[in-house]
Structures are given as structure tokens and as C-alpha cells.
Design a protein with these regions (language model features):
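Active-site acidic Asp-centered loop
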Residues: 122-124
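N-terminal glycine-rich phosphate-binding loop and ensuing alpha1 helix
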Residues: 2-75, 83, 92-94, 110, ...
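Short aromatic/hydrophobic "clamp" motif used to bind/position activated sugar donors
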Residues: 119
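Left-handed beta-helix
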Residues: 1-7, 204, 211-342
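Conserved core of the sugar-phosphate nucleotidyltransferase
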Residues: 115, 129-204, 213-215
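Short aromatic/basic micro-patch
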Residues: 97, 129, 200, 220, ...
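Active-site-proximal specificity loops/subdomain of glycosyltransferases
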Residues: 82-104
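Well-ordered alpha-helical segments embedded in enzymatic catalytic cores
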Residues: 39-43, 102-106, 225
Length: 342
């Protein structure tokens, strides 16, 4: 394992508008997934299992349930191990984060305080397992200034992602944020190379590019920082399909990764984690997802998922109406999960 000083900044401040009405009162990373864990537990577990600490979660929108979950599951529990997880909020209401890059820029004091070699800037709304140290090794071996974790996605869905154009040695030649006409992979016209929203930066470079971006009024990694970096610095794409995590079962989908930013994707990922041979098995003693309870109730959730023909309009949870576009099992999970952490 490579020995370098790394801190992690987890981006958790977005409003999650595509997941409304679930995110009307809760931050997207705090939404329950399956069996007790929240969406944010996947990135935190990957960083903790990779022995990267400290971790700072940059929150903003509806942060109360996220704060409560991290405090009880990570900071007041043995599940957190030796990993330090801290939630950082905007200092005043007038200083709300204007974008992903602005969120990090407003917290550059964390980098100055720890003086790391590398800064991991990771998204908080994806379901996956990843050994981040393998990406660190790739970054160092390439002499990279910035590395972007990437995964092939179907070309018809690529417009929803930041798309990477790279050459044979993974050097990024162009970065296009949610393009109307995504550039396909050279050897596979049906797929494009998508950013996972996980970045490694040399610390000094990150401070410099964010200060320059702030002077230009640029606030977003995908729209501003990465397109510039791909032209002016050594930027590389780390192929997530080559990341190997111990304990993955033979029936699981290799290099499983899902962006759960829509109701359809969120529901689909939950179903992938259910059943006797799930695509993504939540239990893995060699790479645990912190916050997971024993899989009680898994069969019942799977039964509901399989038997659902349509979307009902009401549920018995607290005798409150359920929005018509939210499946029963999703609404019940949200209601019960939030009650449990209250």
C-alpha cells in the first residue's frame, strides 16, 4: 500500500432535485438505501476501508439527518474504526456553496491545516465498492497532477455524465460536462467514458487551480476545473473496471457502480442489492459497508419489489399520503429509516 498523506473531501451539498419528493426534507446522501445504510455510507466506507483519513463531508442542503447519521453511525460507534469523519457546513448563510469547486475553495483551510500530498475529492451519491489506494497507485505511477475515476456507460445515457476523451495511455485530452453529443469510446461506439465524480489532486495544484478559478468566477469541477486541467496539466483517467476489491462473490456484477440521482436509478440500485444472488451484495466482511444491519427483512423487500405492478398513492406509514410517483417500498424505507435515526 502506497504511503502518502491524503485527506478526503466528500461533496454532499447538492439539493438532489431529480430525487424529489424524497429530498424535499433530507439531503440526498442521507437517504436510506437498504438494511440501515445511507447512500453516503458507500463513499465513506470506501475511504475508510482504504485507510484514508481524515474525511470531511461538505454539506449544505437540509443537513440535519446527514449530521445525525454520521454522528451516530460513524463518530459514536465502533463502525467508524480509526477513521475521522467530520461534517463541514457553510460558515454563514451568505456563504452558501455556489458549486462543487466553490465548496472546496471555501474550505481550503482544511488543506492548509493538514498539508497533505494528495486530496481526494469524492462524490457522495453513488453505490459501489472501490479500493481508493489502487487509484492512488495509478496516480503516482503516471506522475499525474489530477486523476479522474472513470467507467464506461451506454452512449444513450452518457449525456447525464461528465465525458472523458482519453488516449491509449489514459491521458485525458478533453473533458465534456453532460454533452449533447457524447464522444464514444474509440473501440466501442456504443459506450462513452464517464467520470464517476471521484478525483485525486496533487494538493498544491488543487489550491492553485481553485484560487485561479475563483478569480474567474468559476465554481464547478465538471464545467470549469476539469476541462481546464485536461488542457494545461497532466490529467489521467483511472479505469474503475480494473479496481479489485476483496470478498466480491462470483455472482455479483464486476465493477458495480450506480449513480442514484434519479428515482429510477435509486429504485434499480436497491433492487440490485436484494435477493439470494444480488448484483451488488451488501455483506462483504473483507470490504464492509459501515452502517449495514444484518440482512433481516431482505426477503420481504425483495418480495415487494418483485410483486409491485404499479405505484400506489397511499401507504400506512404514519397514515400519511405517499406521493404518486414514489414506489411503496421506497417510501416505507425512507419513512422508517428517518424515524429510526430521529
Amino acid at each position: 500500500m502506497t504511503s502518502v498523506n491524503i485527506i478526503a473531501l466528500v461533496l454532499a451539498g447538492g439539493e438532489g432535485a431529480r430525487l424529489l419528493p424524497l429530498t424535499a426534507e433530507h439531503a440526498k446522501p442521507a437517504l436510506p438505501f437498504v438494511n440501515g445504510c445511507r447512500i453516503v455510507d458507500f463513499v465513506l466506507s470506501n475511504l475508510a476501508n482504504s485507510e484514508i483519513s481524515p474525511i470531511y463531508v461538505l454539506a449544505q442542503y437540509k443537513p440535519q439527518s446527514l449530521l445525525r447519521h454520521i454522528e451516530t453511525t460513524w463518530n459514536k460507534s465502533s463502525r467508524g474504526g480509526n477513521c475521522s469523519v467530520n461534517v463541514v457546513l457553510p460558515r454563514t448563510g451568505a456563504e452558501r456553496f455556489l458549486g462543487t469547486a466553490d465548496a472546496v475553495y471555501r474550505n481550503l483551510d482544511l488543506i492548509e491545516r493538514h498539508r497533505p500530498d494528495l486530496v481526494a475529492v469524492f462524490a457522495s451519491d453513488h453505490v459501489y465498492r472501490m479500493d481508493v489506494r489502487q487509484m492512488v497507485d495509478f496516480h503516482l505511477a503516471r506522475g499525474a497532477d489530477v486523476s479522474v475515476a472513470a467507467v464506461p456507460v451506454p452512449i444513450e445515457k452518457a449525456y447525464s455524465f461528465g465525458i472523458i476523451v482519453s488516449d491509449h495511455d489514459h491521458r485525458i485530452r478533453d473533458f465534456q460536462e453532460k454533452p449533447d453529443r457524447p464522444v464514444p469510446l474509440p473501440a466501442d461506439p456504443d459506450r462513452a467514458y464517464a467520470s464517476m465524480g471521484n478525483y485525486l489532486f496533487n494538493a498544491r495544484l488543487l489550491v492553485d487551480v481553485l484560487c485561479r478559478a475563483n478569480r474567474r468566477g468559476e465554481t464547478d469541477f465538471g464545467r470549469h476545473i476539469l476541462p481546464h486541467a485536461s488542457r494545461s496539466h497532466r490529467a489521467f483517467a483511472y479505469d474503475f473496471t480494473g479496481n479489485h476489491v476483496p470478498g466480491v462473490r462470483s455472482h455479483e456484477e464486476r465493477a458495480y457502480w450506480r449513480d442514484v440521482g434519479t428515482l429510477e436509478a435509486y429504485t434499480g440500485a436497491r433492487r440490485d442489492a436484494l435477493g439470494p444472488q444480488p448484483r451488488f451484495h451488501l455483506e462483504n466482511s473483507q470490504w464492509p459497508i459501515r452502517g449495514i444491519r444484518p440482512l433481516e427483512g431482505q426477503r420481504e423487500l425483495a418480495r415487494r419489489s418483485r410483486s409491485r405492478d404499479g405505484l400506489l398513492t397511499h401507504d400506512s406509514v404514519d397514515a400519511r399520503p405517499r406521493p404518486i410517483n414514489v414506489p411503496r417500498e421506497i417510501y416505507e424505507s425512507i419513512a422508517h429509516g428517518m424515524q429510526a435515526s430521529a
